[in-house]
Swiss-Prot record:
Pfam families registered for this protein in UniProt: SNO (PF01174)
Function statement: Catalyzes the hydrolysis of glutamine to glutamate and ammonia as part of the biosynthesis of pyridoxal 5'-phosphate. The resulting ammonia molecule is channeled to the active site of PdxS.
Active-site residues, as the UniProt record annotates them: 84, 178, 180
Gene giving rise to this polypeptide: pdxT
CDD domains for the chain: GATase1_PB (cd01749)
Keyword Hydrolase: yes
Name used for this protein in its record: Pyridoxal 5'-phosphate synthase subunit PdxT
Source organism per UniProt: Archaeoglobus fulgidus (strain ATCC 49558 / DSM 4304 / JCM 9628 / NBRC 100126 / VC-16)
Length: 198
């Protein structure tokens, strides 16, 4: 199994390491590569869009053709995961900040997102969440977005303060938090198996 981590910004190396550990725990022989170029995602079995700044990441993936490769992978039923800014990019609708910056979204998750949903005063925090299919998970939030609305085909996996912070639509997984910043690989393991269950 080959997993691509789109290495434009964010916790790229942490995602690479967490995914390698998850593959090992699942007993799957695999390779995890960080990429900033077209051609790698299209030859992969799964892809991760890490956090960072959503406007910058959007410009780069759409101008370099990586966005088309992510869309194709999702269409093929392969696992796609976005964390923090990656969640924003996976979503169909953004808030006024997303619209004001003309950030192009992939539209793979029928959801509306709000940037910096928990306010600037809570830029970084960690809370235990009850994540469906995973169980209790210590989630790290950093200037996190949240999902405010979902379509009928989206399954809510976790909420915090009445906002959705994890959701799934078939093989696409969106998280407001950073699972790669913990030693717990269960969310990466769940992600890697999404192609089997979608």
């Amino acid at each position: 199994m080959k997993v691509a981590v789109v290495g434009v910004q964010g916790d790229v190396e942490e995602h690479v390491l967490a995914t390698k550990r998850a593959l090992k725990r699942l007993g799957i022989d695999g390779e995890v590569v960080a990429t900033r170029r077209r051609g790698v995602v299209s030859r992969s079995d799964a892809v991760i869009l890490p956090g960072g700044e959503s406007t910058t990441i959007s410009k780069l993936i759409f101008s370099d053709g990586i966005a088309d490769e992510i869309l194709q992978l999702a269409e093929e039923g392969k696992p796609v995961m976005g964390t923090c800014a990656g969640l924003i990019l996976l979503s169909k609708y953004g808030d006024e900040q997303v619209e004001k910056t003309n950030t192009k979204l992939l539209g793979l998750l029928d959801a509306k997102v709000k940037r910096n949903a928990f306010g600037r005063q809570r830029e970084s925090f960690q809370v235990p969440l009850d994540v469906k299919y995973v169980g209790k998970f210590d989630a790290v939030f950093i200037r996190a977005p949240a999902i405010t609305e979902v379509g009928k085909d989206v399954e809510v996996l976790a909420t915090f303060e009445n906002l959705i912070v994890a959701a799934r639509q078939k093989n696409v997984l969106g998280l407001a938090f950073h699972p790669e910043l913990t030693d717990d690989t269960r969310i990466h393991e769940f992600f890697l198996k999404l192609g089997e269950t979608s």
